[in-house]
């Protein structure tokens, strides 16, 4: 009889993007959902410089797929986008078991109180109005929400 303990074998996956950011030392994953290419480029560059692993998509339909496949720690979500609005994306993510607990920051041009109330009712963690914040404010809110334990 062989008394050796078998060596555990790693679980193989065809999709490296499914690895969780909970791995020790791994950068936090941010899904940036923004249809404005210029603004998205600025945010993408700055967030990467801050040490985040960032994936950007330009519409709500792609955001839903990326939330499931990329498994972000936090989503920065525009509201007014082609195909599926940010409000609809938020609603779907909150009602999907795999994404229900995602941290979601709405970053939008919509400044009406009714829009903020709608985002709150749908479960947004934060609601930032583009004209009232600078990128350092957004990074501060991202860090805050990532530091919160569920």
Regions found by a protein language model. Name each.
Residues 82, 100, 112:
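The feature encodes the CheY-like receiver
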């Amino acid at each position: 009889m062989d008394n050796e303990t078998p060596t555990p074998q790693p679980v193989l996956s065809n999709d490296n993007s499914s690895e969780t950011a909970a791995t020790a030392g791994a950068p936090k994953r941010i899904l940036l959902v923004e249809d404005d290419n210029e603004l998205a480029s600025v945010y993408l560059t700055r967030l990467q410089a801050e040490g985040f692993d960032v994936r950007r998509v330009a519409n709500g339909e792609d955001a839903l797929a990326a939330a499931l496949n990329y498994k972000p720690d936090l989503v920065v979500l525009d509201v007014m986008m082609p195909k599926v609005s940010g409000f609809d994306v938020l609603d779907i993510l909150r009602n999907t078991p795999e994404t229900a607990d995602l941290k979601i920051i709405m970053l939008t041009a919509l400044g009406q109180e009714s829009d903020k109330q709608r985002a709150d009712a749908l479960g947004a963690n934060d609601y930032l109005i583009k004209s009232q914040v600078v990128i350092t404010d957004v990074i501060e809110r991202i860090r805050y929400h990532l530091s919160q334990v569920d």
